[in-house]
Swiss-Prot record:
Pfam families: MMM1. One of its GO terms (molecular function) is lipid transfer activity. Component of the ERMES/MDM complex, which serves as a molecular tether to connect the endoplasmic reticulum (ER) and mitochondria. Components of this complex are involved in the control of mitochondrial shape and protein biogenesis, and function in nonvesicular lipid trafficking between the ER and mitochondria. The MDM12-MMM1 subcomplex functions in the major beta-barrel assembly pathway that is responsible for biogenesis of all outer membrane beta-barrel proteins, and acts in a late step after the SAM complex. This is Maintenance of mitochondrial morphology protein 1. The gene is MMM1. It comes from Pyricularia oryzae (strain 70-15 / ATCC MYA-4617 / FGSC 8958). It is a single-pass type I membrane protein. Residues 119-335 form the SMP-LTD domain. GO terms for biological process: aminophospholipid transport; mitochondrial genome maintenance; mitochondrial outer membrane translocase complex assembly; mitochondrion organization; mitochondrion-endoplasmic reticulum membrane tethering; protein insertion into mitochondrial outer membrane; telomere maintenance. Residues 1-19 are lumenal.
């Protein structure tokens, strides 16, 4: 090859126009495949999804238990010395003569409850009380818009993204049925909420030394239609504000819930000034089914997109798991059982509450009328008392003959 000769370049088999057409066709094909298989693809069955979520939750719970057991073996209760020093402090001589603190064993003995042989309870009476409470809550919600206002404020909070328009609640149904609690049993658990195992013999003294407590577990079953429907708009603010608007409507319904509710109490700690707390959570074997309906678009609408239903359901399950499914739990501080002045109601406090609950001018008038009525009633009672005493008081010239005496005539 001579130095001044140029290599021969191969001629392209497709022209620029043909390449552009092939590229456009491939993009359209990819978009169509994405819409068909990703958005409108058939979702997995509810049984498969529920079993997959249950296995994930179970593996997470087992990993948490293993980490707790490994921490126990590595750390030999570093806070035991501090707890012992708190117990050895000098207590008040006034309360020293009282009964000793009840342990798990003494509580079970005094209530005639045997953990190994006691049969689970049906809780029929508790279901009636819960049903009455829920029925009253539903009746109050129908005559008051407070729950609707609270939901609207919560949905349109400060953390709403800029691409989302105002969210409006279009439907709210609190259902018609009631949850059924059953199969209640008492389970001794340790300080971390782990049971002692079905194959191990329960030792109340050892459980008390290890900081154990008693936990009530009951099955919960609810089959109902609790619905919340929303409407909003997706805003496209690029390249300029409100370039496009896409209306979106979503309705989420809870159709079934079944699981195991665990309730226990954490006693107060006087050294840290912590109140007594009620702790509750759900075990990882729960089942929560939703019915999700969606409507996207204004003219050509897409109804009940499966992928939207999957995303919303997955987000709701994650929200529930992160709050009240083991190993996570919810704490509710309980008020003190001893009577206090600040918790007393009635008398002048009732009048003051009425005055505070109304406007300043109207509340003052109502409070003034109430005080006037109270004074009138008090004066009427005092007048009636004086009249009864006056009629009973003998006059000066009255003489009452003694038994056996003779009447003397003037």
């Amino acid at each position: 090859m001579t130095p001044d000769s140029c290599p021969v370049r191969p001629e392209p088999t497709l022209s620029f126009t043909q390449g552009l057409i092939v590229g456009q066709i491939s993009v359209v094909f990819l978009i169509a495949a994405f819409i068909k298989f990703f958005i409108f693809g058939d979702p997995p069955s509810a049984e498969e999804t529920a079993s997959l979520r249950a296995s994930e939750r179970r593996s997470r719970t087992l990993a948490h238990k293993k980490s707790l057991l490994s921490l126990r073996t590595s750390n030999q209760r570093p806070g035991s010395q501090q707890q012992q020093s708190v117990l050895n402090r000098k207590k008040s001589s006034i309360l020293r003569s009282g009964p000793p603190s009840l342990t798990i064993g003494s509580i079970l003995n005094k209530t005639y409850y045997r953990v190994e042989s006691h049969q689970p309870e049906s809780l029929d009476w508790f279901n009636v009380l819960v049903a009455q409470t829920i029925a009253q809550f539903r009746s109050d919600a129908q005559h008051d818009d407070a729950i609707l206002t609270s939901l609207t404020k919560a949905l349109n909070g400060t953390s709403r993204p800029s691409f989302l328009d105002e969210i409006r609640v279009t439907e709210l149904s609190l259902g018609e049925d009631f949850p059924i609690f059953s199969n209640c049993r008492i389970i001794p658990v340790d300080e971390d909420g782990l049971d002692f195992g079905p194959g191990k013999a329960f030792d109340a003294n050892m459980a008390t030394r290890d900081g154990g407590t008693l936990q009530a577990r009951m099955d919960v079953d609810l089959s109902d239609m609790i619905t919340l429907a929303l409407e909003t708009k997706l805003l496209l603010n690029y390249p300029k504000k409100l370039t496009a608007v896409l209306p979106v409507a979503l309705a989420v319904s809870v159709v079934r819930f079944s699981g195991t509710l665990a309730i226990s109490f954490i006693p107060s700690n006087p050294s840290q000034s912590t109140p007594t707390k009620m702790v509750f959570n759900f075990l990882d074997d729960y089942r929560l089914d939703f019915s999700i309906r969606s409507l996207v678009g204004s003219r050509s609408r897409l109804q009940d997109v499966p992928k939207i239903a999957q995303l919303v359901e997955s987000r709701l399950h994650r929200w529930f798991d992160e709050r009240c499914v083991e190993p996570r739990f919810q704490e509710i501080p309980l008020p003190s059982m001893w009577p206090r002045k600040k918790n007393a109601r009635g008398g002048d406090d009732a009048i003051a509450d009425v005055e505070r609950s109304m406007s300043k001018a109207k509340g003052a008038d109502v409070a003034r009328d109430l005080r006037r009525e109270v004074l009138v009633e008090a004066e009427a009672r005092q007048a009636a008392q004086r009249d009864s005493l006056r009629y009973r008081r003998p006059r000066a010239d009255d003489a009452f003959p003694m038994p056996g005496s003779l009447a003397v005539d003037d």
